[in-house]
């Protein structure tokens, strides 16, 4: 994938427009989780050091187009970045038509781009106005790279130069390394509640990986496809035939989808529900499967330890409740200890990484949700595609 890289450009005195992903949770005017801001600072700091005139925008929440509301304002983000830089960072509210100055080595935050008319529909008129503000457009929001919007795609068409920021470059390099040039065996762990939401990912991965580990509610559909009773567990009966065909497809290429041999069950979904260990073929009609058992867990740990590359998206049990979190905890520990190149992404996965404190032991953690999945599906991301075009 050849794109122009920000780090290769001379930015002195240039007007630089950065599209970051600063969509962070805010409570009572304060940022409650700043991981995305931290991830975006490398690009911002690089541009400031080079003496550029730096403008950064992002979406936050789901504002109504054309309507400014306090809860969708980037002001808390501007406050957070001001604190990091030790200087007051201005927030510019009405910026689309310009009319504001930025000094060399100064950073301004441009208010939530999703408030702008034409942003989500990627209107040419809006995109051209964005492009008029800058000499260099920097796409750094991998989290929205799968959406063609005016600030992620349209502006890249019309800006004098369109390049990939430091974070976007890192994300693309890590994903490419994991999926296009993987060290083998390549293992993917896909958890989550429904097969239907991850079906295209599962279909795409069955063509690439050596072992496809399914977890969470998804695993129940595969357990049933393998002939087991899953009781009252979350299970998509209508997708059992598809689960069967994916298992067959993997077998034909001497690859496997390991099926749990023991499980941890409860009668209801509750924090104080006692955990009961059962063989996978002994689940009763009123049981609900909430985790994998120790034998299955050990099998997965062995797979991870022998892997060359591990891609992790989604927990294997209800890890929010500790009694149903043993499987996910053991997998997290194995991912932290394996010599494999490890790549993790998705909200629940990051929550598990934080809970089990292995953040600095994963080779690469993707900040993106949907874009991460679409990359796993083998889809072209529109925001990356336009950067590739502009690099020609």
From Swiss-Prot:
Disulfide bonding pattern of the chain: none
Catalyzed reactions: (2R)-3-phosphoglycerate + ATP = (2R)-3-phospho-glyceroyl phosphate + ADP
Keyword Disulfide bond among UniProt keywords: no
Similarity section: Belongs to the phosphoglycerate kinase family.
Catalytic class of the enzyme: transferase
Quaternary structure note: Monomer.
Organism: Nitrosomonas eutropha (strain DSM 101675 / C91 / Nm57)
E.C. number: 2.7.2.3
UniProt-listed SUPFAM superfamilies: Phosphoglycerate kinase
Membrane-spanning segments: none
Cell location: Cytoplasm
Binding site for ATP: 198, 320, 346-349
Any GO molecular function: ATP binding
Residues that, per the record, bind substrate: 21-23, 36, 59-62, 114, 147
PANTHER family: PHOSPHOGLYCERATE KINASE, PHOSPHOGLYCERATE KINASE 1, CHLOROPLASTIC-RELATED
Pfam families: PGK
GO cellular component, one term: cytosol
Higher taxonomy: Bacteria, Pseudomonadati, Pseudomonadota, Betaproteobacteria, Nitrosomonadales
InterPro entries: Phosphoglycerate_kinase (IPR001576), Phosphoglycerate_kinase_CS (IPR015911), Phosphoglycerate_kinase_N (IPR015824), Phosphoglycerate_kinase_sf (IPR036043)
Gene: pgk
Protein name: Phosphoglycerate kinase
The keyword Transferase is assigned to this record: yes
């Amino acid at each position: 994938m050849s794109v122009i890289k920000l780090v290769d450009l001379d930015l002195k005195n240039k007007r630089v427009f950065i599209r970051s992903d600063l969509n962070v949770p805010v409570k009572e005017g304060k940022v409650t989780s700043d991981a995305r801001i931290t991830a975006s600072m490398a690009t911002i700091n690089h541009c400031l050091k080079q003496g550029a005139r730096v403008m950064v925008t992002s979406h936050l929440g789901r504002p109504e187009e054309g309507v400014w509301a306090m809860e969708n304002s980037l002001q808390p983000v501007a406050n957070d970045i001001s604190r990091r830089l030790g200087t007051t960072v201005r927030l510019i509210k009405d910026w689309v038509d310009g009319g504001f100055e930025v000094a060399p080595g100064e950073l301004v935050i441009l208010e939530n781009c999703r408030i702008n008319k034409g942003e989500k529909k990627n209107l040419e008129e809006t995109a051209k106005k964005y492009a008029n503000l800058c000499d260099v457009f920097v796409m750094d929001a991998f989290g929205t790279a799968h959406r063609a919007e005016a600030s992620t795609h349209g502006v890249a068409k019309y800006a004098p130069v369109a390049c990939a920021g430091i974070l976007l470059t890192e994300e693309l390099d890590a994903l490419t390394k994991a999926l296009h040039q993987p060290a083998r065996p390549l293992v993917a762990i896909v958890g989550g509640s429904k097969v239907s939401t991850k079906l295209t990912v599962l279909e795409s991965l069955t063509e690439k990986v050596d072992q496809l580990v399914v977890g969470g509610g998804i695993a129940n559909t595969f357990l049933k496809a393998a002939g087991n009773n899953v009781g009252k567990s979350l299970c998509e009966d209508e997708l059992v035939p598809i689960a069967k065909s994916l298992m067959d497809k993997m077998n034909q290429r001497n690859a496997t989808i390991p099926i749990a041999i023991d499980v941890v069950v409860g009668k209801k979904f509750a924090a104080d529900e006692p955990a009961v260990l059962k063989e996978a073929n002994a689940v009763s009609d009123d049981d609900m499967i909430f985790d994998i058992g120790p034998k299955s867990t050990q099998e997965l740990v062995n797979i991870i330890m022998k892997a060359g590359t591990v891609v992790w998206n989604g927990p294997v049990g209800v890890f929010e409740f500790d009694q149903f979190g043993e499987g996910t905890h053991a997998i997290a520990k194995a991912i932290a200890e394996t010599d494999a190149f490890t790549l993790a992404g998705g909200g629940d996965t990051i929550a598990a990484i934080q809970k089990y404190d292995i953040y600095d032991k994963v080779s690469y953690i993707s900040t993106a949700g949907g874009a991460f999945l679409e990359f796993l599906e083998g889809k072209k991301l529109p925001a990356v595609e336009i950067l590739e075009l502009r690099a020609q």
